[in-house]
Amino acid sequence: MATEESGGLAQTAAVKLSEMGERTKQLGNAIQDPERQRRIILVIVCVALLLDNMLYMVIVPIVPDYLAHLESESEQAHVKGNSSINITQNENFDLQIGVLFASKAILQLLVNPLTGTFIDRVGYDIPLLIGLSIMFVSTCIFAFAENYATLFMARSLQGLGSAFADTSGIAMIADKYAEESERSRALGIALAFISFGSLAAPPFGGVLYEFAGKRFPFIALACVCLADGILCLTVLKPFSSRTRENMPVGTPIYKLMIDPYIAVVAGALTTCNIPLAFLEPTIANWMEETMNASQWQIGITWLPAFFPHILGVYLTVKLAAKYPHLQWFYGALGMVIIGASSCIVPACKNFEQLIIPLCGVCFGIALVDTALLPTLAFLVDVRHVSVYGSVYAIADISYCVAYALGPIVAGKIVHDLGFVQLNLGMGLANVLYAPALLLLRNVSLMKPSHSERNMLLEEGATGLYDTIRMEERQRKKHGYSSSGNCVPIDENGTFAGQSKSFSEEETSEPEYI
């Protein structure tokens, strides 16, 4: 009897394992479906961007109060009864907070040119996994840090992780969604996650810090980051057999930087984000001084702006699908809205009035970002090689310039010139830059480059000479010609016996730029 029962249990277990194996196989096949895989990749990238921006902003209500608590005892003993020293200590503390907040963007700004080139060489999946791993470590350090130096290290490490994860994630979306309307929609979804992470993180961090302590918000984010990394490792399989050698060589980042169209887009991305980057560290003190705002009002200042940001993304995606040739106009309109809203901010007398221009700023940023990020990919497609790591590293650099300067420079400007002058200057800069986007008005009419390299790699051979040329390139490293007769070729890829060689410029079709 016991033998029969054990045999039945073994048979049942075998059936269960077989069913589980079959389901796992079906799941694997479903994941390998190209359309499903694109959606999963979009989810992975969006979660990575959400985490990065939540970690960027979640420290706003936590770190200043936590550092003040750590330093209060030593400062109390040192400055008791000495107001001049107390003022100096407060100024130094504000500077420390500003440098801590800016350190992430500064390191990200410095590393991005290198990560862009690295992404172009190895692909998008490995850098994304590297970025998620670094962000996980950074978040754990934040959770257990107990002094300024450790917090500074964690913040800087986050910048390194962001340089990998943000750039590779956006570039991967541009690569997977090659059709313009799909690309615009996918990048719009990514921007919505970025916005939600930035605007929802301060109240998320503030509430959890108040009721669960400093560690819990960071541990929660670290768990989500770990899950996203495991999903990336499972779905993308970044360390499986590589095929990068079959892909085109990306355009060097310095060449992309001097492209006038890409430079105009990069300048617009920097300029439109300056109001947000400069207002975030300064608006709380201004609200306390001018409208006696309560702490809960300061905490949710930017939360209502999430909804117009989503509206701006949605409208731009819909309009771009219907009128793709007006992308430059959507960006210019967004910059004008940002400029007007920035100028209105100092005129607000209460919290309810302030919500309106802040919503205008975020609505305008949504228009600019959603219109111009797909434009960068299109410019690379038609003017360079369709590899997107370096061009989105330039976009990330543009954002980092604004957010590196904001926490350090904004407070100094307010102190020396005033809050009104800061907002008028930011508004004027956006309005004056908007006409520069007229340079992009004919971008939609550009034709893809038909240089020899693009033609051979992307379109295949179109004639006898092109066929021979392509075969020569494929066998060049072996030292043989395409005919298989072991005829040596020289270092330029031409037959050694030829008296005349041709350069790429002489043999390629003209580029339409």
Curated annotation (Swiss-Prot):
GO terms for cellular component: AP-1 adaptor complex; AP-2 adaptor complex; terminal bouton. Keywords: Glycoprotein, Membrane, Neurotransmitter transport, Transmembrane, Transmembrane helix, Transport. The keyword Membrane applies. Pfam families: MFS_1. Residues 475-513 are annotated as: Disordered. Residues 61-98, 147-156, 208-215, 279-296, 349-353, 412-418 are lumenal, vesicle. Disulfide bonds: none annotated. The chain crosses the membrane at residues 40-60, 99-119, 126-146, 157-174, 187-207, 216-236, 258-278, 297-317, 328-348, 354-374, 391-411, 419-439. Belongs to the major facilitator superfamily. Vesicular transporter family. Involved in acetylcholine transport into synaptic vesicles. This is Probable vesicular acetylcholine transporter-A. It comes from Danio rerio (Zebrafish). The lineage of its organism: Eukaryota, Metazoa, Chordata, Craniata, Vertebrata.
